[in-house]
Amino acid sequence: MKKKGGRKIFGFMVKEEKEEKKGSVEFQVFSFTNKIRRLASHLELHKKDFSSERGLRRLLGKRRRLLAYLAKKNRVRYKKLISQLNIREQ
């Protein structure tokens, strides 16, 4: 434990674990899914926002490619992720 400015800051290892998780395929798919859901709800209100629609399509493509990669490399992790996020299988 380190002290900085009167506050206790817990470990160096916590930051490392967070950084490791950010790079994983599962975290990236999770992040893209959250962005996709947010953009989809935005587009329901703003039907003529074509730049956001294009951004949504790009995110869908990125997520699809990551899911295809994960399905090819590790089918068990792919199935688990699909069920957790409630998204359809390709």
UniProtKB/Swiss-Prot annotation:
Pfam families in alphabetical order: Ribosomal_S15
GO molecular function: structural constituent of ribosome
Keywords, in A-Z order: Chloroplast, Plastid, Ribonucleoprotein, Ribosomal protein
Statement: the UniProt record of this protein carries the keyword Ribonucleoprotein: yes
Cellular localisation: Plastid, Chloroplast
GO terms for cellular component: chloroplast; ribonucleoprotein complex; ribosome
GO biological process, one term: translation
Subunit structure, as described in the record: Part of the 30S ribosomal subunit.
Family label: Belongs to the universal ribosomal protein uS15 family.
Protein name: Small ribosomal subunit protein uS15c
Gene: rps15-A
